[in-house]
Amino acid sequence: MTFAAAQATYVLHSRPYKETSALVDFFTAQGRLRAVLRGARGKAGALARPFVPLEAEWRGRGELKTVARLESAGIPNLLSGQALFSGLYLNELLIRLLPAEDPQPEIFAHYAATLPLLAAGRPLEPLLRAFEWRLLEQLGYGFALDVDIHGRPIEPQALYQLLPEAGLEPVTQLQPGLFQGVELLSMADADWSAPGALAAAKRLMRQALAPHLGGRPLVSRELFMNRKESPRD
């Protein structure tokens, strides 16, 4: 049985396992991994919550490891309301899209930097779009926003459709799901002050992510929509 050196980590998801243990999905710079946390009803279980900076060691050679040590490594990021659902959304994307134990230091660093901004109440949409874009790029699914699939510069007044495996294709006929060139150029510059840029970026990221999510809806997105539709007291 091997022991992994201590690593900075975050809990993505945890669920009960057997009588007193938990099955936990962790995210580290060395990738996503799953481990059994024994004594989950004690101190370790109280630590194993999403958005808390942790330091952990694991043992085991197979895909399912065992937590050997788990300690706090910083101030918890306390998320509530829409920020909480946004954090859960990021966690679900990582669970669904990251291969197990595939090192992703850039994504980990971006995730660790995003959580405090969510906790601080920063505008959510730019943070989510930036994270989605970084995730797509690092996993090899990115595409250019300033040139089309033929290598021609994006024209502000032209219309484009996204071909997820290729990039942006110019079109001449109106159809659902198109993007204006001016919107794409605003996204390329991360200029969220441009009219319609954030809404277009949300549509674009949803189209870009869909083929890689396997057709299954995101639970966090459904929870958020249900919360918005629930009548308030």
UniProtKB/Swiss-Prot annotation:
Signal peptide start-end: none
Domain of life where this protein originates: Bacteria
GO cellular component, one term: bacterial nucleoid
GO term, biological process aspect, one: double-strand break repair
Keywords: DNA damage, DNA recombination, DNA repair
Pfam families given in the database record: RecO_C, RecO_N
InterPro entries: ARFGAP/RecO, DNA_rep/recomb_RecO_N, NA-bd_OB-fold, RecO, RecO_C
HAMAP family tied to this protein: RecO
Family note: Belongs to the RecO family.
Summary of the function given for this chain in its UniProt record: Involved in DNA repair and RecF pathway recombination.
NCBIfam families: reco (TIGR00613)
Name the record gives this protein: DNA repair protein RecO
Taxonomic lineage of the native organism: Bacteria, Pseudomonadati, Pseudomonadota, Gammaproteobacteria, Pseudomonadales
Gene giving rise to this polypeptide: recO
